[in-house]
């Protein structure tokens, strides 16, 4: 027997896990992508959303591309939902589907075993607000794993290297949520190895870039795919009167990060 979850699943959170754990059926997810109102503040891209669902919900995933299949709610039900042969459907109170924007109450008339979940403080919009307001640790408590980005290391101007802090530079995806500029404590996953460091997010021409200084690491990793997880916000972006002042600020960030990491159970963050 199967339970079908329908939604964007942008940032898998503890609420999703609770629903899965309290369902009697095998989970399936109908993941909605490319909604008609183009969204530019996604927490994660499609690839990461699918990966999180498979990892944490242990669910099979069907992706429905709205842009490629523009249809009304009845057609969506007949062509997409019915073919999945589910025994239960789970949607949120704020969920609307089809180009005629029908809701869960309408769906329940067609499919009796539809569960409509009330919107709570466990939602992607709440998590976005926490990230926007520099309340990173609150966001991370709601997510199934602390907020992260994935990117390829590119060449930079290497100015930080001259100050004694070589960095791995990753260009941020401009379709995702614009993160606040400033310094962060980060965890870096590179070639299945875990490192820690400080990440500095700043604007470089048209791109938002994260320059990450990895502690006790000085290898050349250009072109490598890395996953960097934001653990704690340190400070907002500042202008410095001299290179010496900038170097002092970076060293202060590093010292703060090292002390903070010493006091954490790293297996639980």
From Swiss-Prot:
Give the record's family classification: Belongs to the RibF family.
The domain of life is: Bacteria
Q: In which pathway does it act?
A: Cofactor biosynthesis; FAD biosynthesis; FAD from FMN: step 1/1; Cofactor biosynthesis; FMN biosynthesis; FMN from riboflavin (ATP route): step 1/1
Physiological role: Catalyzes the phosphorylation of riboflavin to FMN followed by the adenylation of FMN to FAD.
Under the heading InterPro entries, the entry gives: Cyt_trans-like (IPR004821), FAD_synthase (IPR015864), Riboflavin_kinase (IPR023468), Riboflavin_kinase_bac (IPR002606), Riboflavin_kinase_bac/euk (IPR015865), Riboflavin_kinase_dom_sf (IPR023465), Rossmann-like_a/b/a_fold (IPR014729)
Its name, as the record gives it, is: Bifunctional riboflavin kinase/FMN adenylyltransferase
One GO process term, biological-process aspect = FAD biosynthetic process
As its record notes, the protein acts as a catalyst of:
riboflavin + ATP = FMN + ADP + H(+); FMN + ATP + H(+) = FAD + diphosphate
State the EC number(s).
2.7.1.26, 2.7.7.2
Encoded by which gene? ribF
Q: Which SMART domains match?
A: Flavokinase
Q: Which GO terms describe its molecular function?
A: ATP binding; FMN adenylyltransferase activity; riboflavin kinase activity
Q: Which UniProt keywords apply?
A: ATP-binding, FAD, Flavoprotein, FMN, Kinase, Multifunctional enzyme, Nucleotide-binding, Nucleotidyltransferase, Transferase
Native organism taxonomy: Bacteria, Bacillati, Mycoplasmatota, Mycoplasmoidales, Mycoplasmoidaceae
């Amino acid at each position: 027997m199967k339970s079908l979850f329908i939604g964007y699943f942008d940032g898998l959170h503890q609420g999703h896990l609770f629903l899965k754990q309290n369902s009697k059926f095998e989970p399936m997810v109908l993941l909605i992508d490319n909604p008609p109102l183009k969204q530019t503040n996604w927490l994660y891209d499609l690839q990461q959303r699918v990966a999180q669902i498979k990892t944490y919900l242990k669910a099979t995933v069907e992706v429905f591309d709205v842009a490629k299949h523009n249809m009304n709610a009845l057609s969506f039900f007949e062509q997409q939902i019915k073919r999945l042969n589910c025994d239960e459907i789970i949607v949120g109170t704020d969920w609307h589907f089809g180009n005629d924007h029908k809701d869960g109450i309408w769906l329940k008339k067609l499919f009796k075993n539809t569960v409509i979940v009330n919107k709570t403080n466990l939602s992607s919009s709440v998590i976005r607000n926490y990230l926007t307001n520099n309340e990173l640790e609150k966001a991370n408590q709601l997510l199934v794993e602390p907020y992260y980005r994935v990117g390829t290391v590119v060449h930079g101007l290497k100015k930080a290297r001259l100050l004694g802090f070589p960095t791995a530079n990753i260009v941020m995806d401009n379709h995702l949520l614009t993160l606040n500029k400033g310094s962060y404590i980060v965890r870096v996953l590179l070639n299945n190895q875990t490192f820690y460091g400080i990440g500095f997010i700043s604007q470089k021409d048209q791109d938002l870039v994260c320059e990450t200084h990895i502690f006790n690491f000085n290898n050349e990793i250009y072109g490598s795919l890395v996953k960097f997880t934001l653990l704690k916000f340190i400070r907002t972006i500042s202008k410095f009167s001299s290179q010496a002042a900038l170097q002092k600020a970076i060293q202060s960030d590093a010292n703060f990060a090292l002390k903070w990491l010493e006091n954490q159970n790293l297996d639980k963050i």
